[in-house]
């Protein structure tokens, strides 16, 4: 089994983002990706990852109003994992690598192939796209971060366009806003990292909360779901070989 710890926060209390790669224990096994709902922990990461690697995982494919889903049950006797959710449901469309091999409504034990723990800042220092979108009245433009990553093994570069938020801009203010994005946004973002969770997440650390980031606390982490980007890469490959090299910004009129 492979285990990985990504420390994006060094505080005594942190948000744990846990993802497993598992294989069903049956005659026609499906390969699955399972992510645990984020939880708060104060356990040293090295201790927590050891306990995470020694749990028993059961899965069952079910049907929900949101589509095919996986019901996950994680069993552990360790007090270290007391804060971790033990029963939850995740989207099967994202988590299944081999969906045709997964039986319906059958509870199946799984073998853990890899486990990743990412230590993020505490819950009150995390912001999502949804958090910002809800705060915008009469939006006219979208702010897009063009995050560039490089595979340090192959030197291949990937640019991931990431929606940050919508803003309301009058035409006479647009030129001024475009002029300040280069400096203001560049100063606001110090780094961006890809982490394995619900497929892949982009974690952006915001150091300055001016302008477009005024609703984000300084020094907080902004989380963006990357969906299918790089989903075929292994946990090990993404966490060790993909490095953030640059971030550019674009302001685009909202499309109907």
Swiss-Prot record:
A GO term, aspect molecular function: structural constituent of virion
Key word rRNA processing present: no
Outcome (variant: residue 170 to A): About 80% loss of host transcriptional inhibition activity
Keywords: Host cell membrane, Host cytoplasm, Host membrane, Host nucleus, Host-virus interaction, Membrane, Phosphoprotein, Viral matrix protein, Virion
Modification Phosphothreonine occurs at: 205
InterPro entries referenced in this protein's UniProt entry, alphabetically: Matrix_Pneumo_C, MATRX_N_pneumovirus, Pneu_matrix_N
Topology in the lipid bilayer: Peripheral membrane protein
Region of interest (Interaction with M2-1), ranges: 1-110
Post-translational modifications: Phosphorylation is important for oligomerization.
Gene Ontology, cellular component aspect: host cell cytoplasm; host cell nucleus; host cell plasma membrane; membrane; viral envelope; viral tegument
Renumbered residue ranges of the record's region Nuclear targeting and binding to host importin KPNB1: 110-183
Gene3D superfamilies associated with the record: HRSV-S2 matrix protein, N-terminal domain
Residue ranges annotated as motif Nuclear export signal: 194-206
Subcellular compartments: Virion; Host cytoplasm; Host nucleus; Host cell membrane
An annotated GO BP: virion assembly
Subunit organization: Forms dimers. Forms higher-order oligomers. Interacts with glycoprotein G (via N-terminus). Interacts with protein M2-1; this interaction directs the matrix protein localization to cytoplasmic inclusions comprising viral proteins L, N, P, and M2-1 and mediates the matrix protein association with the nucleocapsid. Interacts with host importin KPNB1; this interaction mediates nuclear import of the matrix protein early during infection. Interacts with host AP3M1; this interaction plays an essential role in trafficking the matrix protein in host cells.
Family, as annotated: Belongs to the pneumovirinae M protein family.
Name of the molecule in the record: Matrix protein
Organism: Human respiratory syncytial virus A (strain A2)
Gene name in the database record: M
């Amino acid at each position: 089994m492979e285990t990985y710890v990504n420390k994006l926060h060094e505080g005594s209390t942190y948000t744990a983002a846990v993802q497993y790669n598992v294989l069903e224990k049956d005659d026609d096994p499906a390969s699955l990706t399972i992510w645990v709902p984020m939880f708060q922990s104060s356990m040293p990461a090295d201790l927590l990852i050891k306990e995470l690697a020694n749990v028993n995982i059961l899965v069952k494919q079910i049907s929900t109003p949101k589509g095919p889903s996986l019901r996950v049950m994680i069993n552990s006797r360790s007090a270290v994992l007391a804060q971790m959710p033990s029963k939850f449901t995740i989207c099967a469309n994202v988590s299944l690598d081999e969906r045709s091999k997964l039986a319906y409504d059958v509870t199946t034990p799984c073998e853990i192939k890899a486990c990743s723990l990412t230590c993020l800042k505490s819950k009150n220092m995390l912001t999502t796209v949804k958090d910002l979108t809800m705060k915008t009245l009469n939006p006219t433009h979208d702010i897009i971060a063009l995050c560039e990553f490089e595979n340090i093994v192959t030197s291949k570069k990937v640019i991931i366009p990431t929606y940050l938020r919508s803003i309301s801009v009058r035409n006479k203010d647009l030129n001024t806003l475009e002029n300040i994005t280069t400096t203001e946004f560049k100063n606001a973002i110090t780094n961006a990292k890809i982490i394995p969770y619900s497929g892949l997440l982009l974690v952006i650390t915001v150091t300055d909360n001016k302008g477009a980031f005024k609703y984000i606390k300084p020094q907080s982490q902004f989380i963006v779901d990357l969906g299918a980007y790089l989903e075929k890469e292994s946990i090990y490959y993404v966490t060790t070989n993909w490095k953030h090299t640059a971030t550019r910004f674009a302001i685009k009129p909202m499309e109907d």
